[in-house]
């Protein structure tokens, strides 16, 4: 339990004792005491509405109850400096800030671990994100999925979960056959044979042309294979080429995976047949119009879904069911999928399919990622000036840098539409959120370097009582919120809460910096302030690391 949680828990316990001492209610009758942070700092550090909740039990008006609680409160034990009754009976608590100084020592002690939960909570989460088809380049939608997914994985890990990061490689569907036939056409074209036409819905990108040329140069003997063998070969080679490029782009985007799960493996291991037989044995499938259907309406879906079409081919849904059942079999407590906006209709059917196996549907969480518009000079940018095609992740990285791209793409809740201002992302000004945050870190490093030249280094032995400036106290309170913010971001699957926190912390630091000089002739006070800003540095660095963004020491 972090310091903030300890303080809140102590306050709740002391309020509970006060209620009993005031004879307002028996211990067994006292409802849960809720502690909130007031929106306005003027209303204290914490507030509770317990006096209003107790009116029926205590049979008194809420302000009388509030006064009785205040009169019997052990303020010393509760770390409270001042108490105020407001409105109809809210109780506002102004804490004794002495407890905050422990945060400095904790940050310096834990360093890179500061903010993270010390112990695992025993929960296994499989987080699937990106999972783009290996048929072309990654684009802005994939970039948002990658940034949000990787950041969420970092946050969940810091919050004590065991997280497996997984990319589902769609290497077995019709789109891969189309990829193979597209490569085949370009392969023979490179050999001077134009008789092979591009398939309907084929891939016309420059990357396919390059793959065809490369194979024609290195493996001209492929032309002598039978058509079936040639298409089988082009399927594998095409996926290998595309996946190598995707892996490189994602790695350069500071996005990493524990597993690259092949759809083909589901067929090879017989898992699709296994789940189909299992669902049939349980009575959840039926035949109609020559097709095999799953009774997903039994589990709140709006209609039943086809598993096998009347031509004998599987729908995409069947291997997806097998894949998610495989995830459960691997011992995962919770499955989290980050899907594009076009997958919204997939949620109910996928949850319903798991329920056919007796798996509770709430074990599968699906986060729909909304669209991103790339903006430049106030105008939407849809096509690359260089290639004439949709702008790729690689081009975005080259244009604004990895740090800015990742930070901007995690600044908003994933379920909201977002305009990515590329000009702003490149600015070296306070208007650029990532520059603003990184500059705060670099500024702290500069001050620490100057202090070291004077022989002053961050120390837990500094006299923290010398930290009295209101801006310094506000800054320290913000540092103390870090672990709680991580826990909140993890529980709500909300990576943007970390970028919001980073902005707040950087803002508090800049206000403090403008209000109080750190390096002065008062050596003891300087030591205390150096320890404070080192705690801020550690917090900023760790928070930026969660988002996959660097914390530069100079700028």
Curated annotation (Swiss-Prot):
Its EC number is 6.1.1.19. GO terms for biological process: arginyl-tRNA aminoacylation. InterPro entries: aa-tRNA-synth_I_CS, Arg-tRNA-ligase, Arg-tRNA-synth_N, Arg-tRNA-synth_N_sf, ArgRS_core, DALR_anticod-bd, Rossmann-like_a/b/a_fold, tRNAsynth_Ia_anticodon-bd. A motif ('HIGH' region) lies at residues 132-142. CDD domains: Anticodon_Ia_Arg, ArgRS_core. Gene3D superfamilies: Arginyl tRNA synthetase N-terminal domain (3.30.1360.70), HUPs (3.40.50.620), Isoleucyl-tRNA Synthetase, Domain 1 (1.10.730.10). It is found in: Cytoplasm. Pfam families: Arg_tRNA_synt_N (PF03485), DALR_1 (PF05746), tRNA-synt_1d (PF00750). GO terms for cellular component: cytoplasm. It catalyses: tRNA(Arg) + L-arginine + ATP = L-arginyl-tRNA(Arg) + AMP + diphosphate. GO terms for molecular function: arginine-tRNA ligase activity; ATP binding. Keywords: Aminoacyl-tRNA synthetase, ATP-binding, Cytoplasm, Ligase, Nucleotide-binding, Protein biosynthesis. Monomer. Belongs to the class-I aminoacyl-tRNA synthetase family. PANTHER family: ARGININE--TRNA LIGASE, CYTOPLASMIC, ARGINYL-TRNA SYNTHETASE. NCBIfam families: argS (TIGR00456). This is Arginine--tRNA ligase. It comes from Staphylococcus saprophyticus subsp. saprophyticus (strain ATCC 15305 / DSM 20229 / NCIMB 8711 / NCTC 7292 / S-41).
């Amino acid at each position: 339990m972090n310091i903030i949680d300890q303080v809140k828990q102590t306050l709740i316990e002391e309020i509970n004792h006060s209620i009993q001492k005031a004879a307002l209610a028996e211990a067994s009758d006292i409802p849960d005491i809720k502690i909130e942070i007031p929106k306005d700092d003027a209303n204290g550090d914490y507030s509770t509405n317990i006096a209003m909740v107790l009116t029926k039990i205590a049979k008194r008006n809420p302000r009388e109850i509030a006064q009785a609680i205040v009169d019997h409160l052990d303020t010393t034990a509760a770390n409270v400096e001042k108490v105020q009754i407001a409105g109809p009976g809210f109780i506002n608590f102004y804490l004794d800030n002495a407890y905050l100084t422990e945060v400095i020592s904790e940050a310096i002690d834990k360093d890179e671990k500061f903010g993270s939960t010390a112990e695992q909570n025993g929960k296994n989460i499989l987080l699937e994100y990106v999972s783009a088809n290996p048929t072309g380049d990654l684009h802005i939608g994939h970039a948002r999925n990658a940034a949000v997914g990787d950041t969420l994985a970092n946050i969940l890990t810091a919050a004590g979960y065991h997280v497996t990061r997984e990319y589902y490689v769609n290497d077995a569907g019709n789109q891969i056959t189309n990829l193979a036939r597209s490569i085949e056409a370009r392969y023979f074209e490179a050999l001077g044979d134009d008789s092979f036409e591009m398939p309907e819905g084929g891939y016309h990108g420059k990357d396919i042309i390059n793959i065809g040329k490369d194979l024609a140069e290195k493996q001209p003997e492929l032309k002598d294979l039978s058509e079936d063998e040639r298409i089988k070969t082009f399927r594998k080679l095409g996926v290998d080429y595309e996946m190598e490029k995707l892996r490189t782009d994602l790695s350069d985007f500071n996005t990493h995976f524990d597993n690259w799960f092949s759809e083909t493996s589901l067929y090879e291991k017989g898992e699709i047949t296994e789940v189909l037989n299992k669902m049939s044995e349980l009575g959840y499938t039926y035949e109609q119009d020559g097709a095999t259907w799953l009774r997903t309406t039994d589990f709140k879906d709006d209609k039943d879904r086809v598993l096998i079409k009347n031509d004998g081919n599987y729908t995409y849904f069947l291997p997806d069911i097998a894949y998610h059942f495989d995830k459960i079999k691997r011992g995962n407590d919770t499955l989290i999928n980050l899907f594009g906006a076009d997958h919204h209709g997939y949620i109910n059917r996928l949850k319903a399919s798991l329920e056919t196996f007796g798996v509770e549907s709430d074990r599968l969480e699906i986060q729909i990622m909304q669209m991103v518009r790339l903006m430049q000079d106030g105008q939407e940018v849809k096509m690359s000036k260089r290639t004439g095609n949709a702008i790729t992740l690689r081009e975005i990285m080259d244009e604004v840098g990895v740090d800015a791209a990742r930070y901007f793409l995690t600044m908003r809740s994933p379920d909201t539409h977002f305009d990515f201002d590329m000009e702003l992302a490149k600015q070296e000004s306070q208007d650029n959120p990532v520059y603003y945050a990184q500059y705060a870190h670099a500024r702290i490093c500069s001050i620490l370097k100057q202090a070291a030249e004077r022989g002053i280094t961050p120390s837990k032995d500094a006299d923290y009582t010398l930290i009295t400036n209101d801006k310094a106290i506000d800054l320290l309170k913000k540092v103390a919120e870090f672990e709680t913010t991580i826990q909140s971001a993890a529980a709500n699957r909300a990576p943007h809460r970390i970028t919001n926190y980073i902005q707040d912390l950087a803002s508090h630091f800049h206000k403090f910096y403008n209000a109080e000089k750190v390096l002065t002739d008062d050596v003891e006070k300087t030591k205390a302030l150096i320890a404070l800003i080192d705690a801020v540095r550690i917090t900023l660095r760790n928070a930026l690391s969660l988002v996959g963004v660097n914390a530069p020491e100079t700028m």
